[in-house]
Amino acid sequence: RGLGDVYKRQDQKVRQRVGQVQRDMVLREQLHVLQHELGEDGDDELYEYEERIGRCRASDEVREKLMKELHRLSKQPFGSAEGAVIRNYLDVCLDVPWGVETHDRADVEQARKILDRDHYGLEKVKERILEFIAVRQLNPQAKGKILCLVGPPGVGKTSIALSVAKAMHRKLSRLSLGGVRDEADIRGHRKTYIGAMPGRIIDAVIRSGSMNPLLVLDEIDKLASDMRGDPASALLEVLDSEQNHAFRDHFLEVPVDLSRVMFITTANTLDTIPRPLLDRMEVIELSSYTDEEKLQIAKRHLLPKQLKEHGLKKTQLRITDDAIRRVIAAYTKESGVRVLERQLGKLCRKAAMQLVEGDVKRVDVTESNLKELLGTERYSAVSYTHLRAHETELHLV
């Protein structure tokens, strides 16, 4: 009798399990029909992911990882939180431009033309950049040092990096490091965290759409560190040519080859850049502009740009050289030309108002009517550059 009870209990358990399995199968089939009616067929989604993974030009290790995640996704019930995490992970991984590269055009003469067209002066800086490009032309596989452009705000550090990207025919992506305190901003957050995303480096590569872009790391001297980690240490791995061929972002969890990426960093000062980071970079210093250089930059670059942005033609606004000199001396006090560009933009807006409201067909800006347009002079009309030179002479005496 005891043995019969055991068989009976086992038979009941088997029947219960079979019933549960059959119930689950029926529910899954009903869910599948509902998803199909709603246009949310999970099989179509899985097939699409599988096709994208098949077309992906990533390494076998990466594709194997993606297929594992896809298999996990197939086991998730519709609408589950974990399913959403896996979908986000697959989407980000497949957005990485695996195997996509642009062909370098390391032509020194073309680079010289672009640098001369986009920037006035800065001869020593241009020469060093051309040397850098010449080495790339002779040896495309050369692991040159990272360039670090150092100088006051507004002297053209970032715009020079843009010109280098044009000259080398590389995609460009910029990221600002100012105020970055968390190491996860560089390495990314693990995908299990809510709202997790890859770090800024991988994000910049994705935005560029190429595995060999030129990445401009702005304000590298503004990096900070706190209890959440040291982002400068994470950057060491990114910039080190011996390590960055297998950079691991915490979100992606697979190696990414950054060895083909060209990095240019910018900074206002070297004092706050950690020494290990500085040792991996070659510093190119950009000095302040003289008043005459500012005048030429305004005429060749800033004014044409502002005219275009404000919808004005060259024939509708004329600014004399003396007026620009007065703007430089009395309305700006800077090493670069950012404030000068803003003041020229203000003159363009004033001109636009006069052209729209009045009967004038051209606005002439001279030294005599400058106050009417820009208001009271902010600084002494003595040249700021000359004033600094005079102070230096007094100090030497």
Where in the sequence are the language-model features?
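Extended, charged alpha-helical coiled-coil/arm scaffolds that mediate oligomerization and mechanical coupling
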Residues: 1, 5-135
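C-terminal engagement/docking regions of AAA+ P-loop ATPases
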Residues: 338, 343-388
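AAA+/P-loop NTPase substrate/partner-engagement loops
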Residues: 169-194
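Conserved catalytic/switch belt of AAA+ P-loop NTPases
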Residues: 221-255
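Walker A/P-loop
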Residues: 147-175
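AAA+/SF3 P-loop NTPase mechanochemical coupling elements
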Residues: 208-212, 248-266
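Conserved C-terminal "switch" segment of AAA+ ATPases
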Residues: 58-59, 270-279, 287-334, 338-339, ...
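Conserved small/polar residues in nucleotide/adenosyl-binding loops
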Residues: 2-10, 385-394
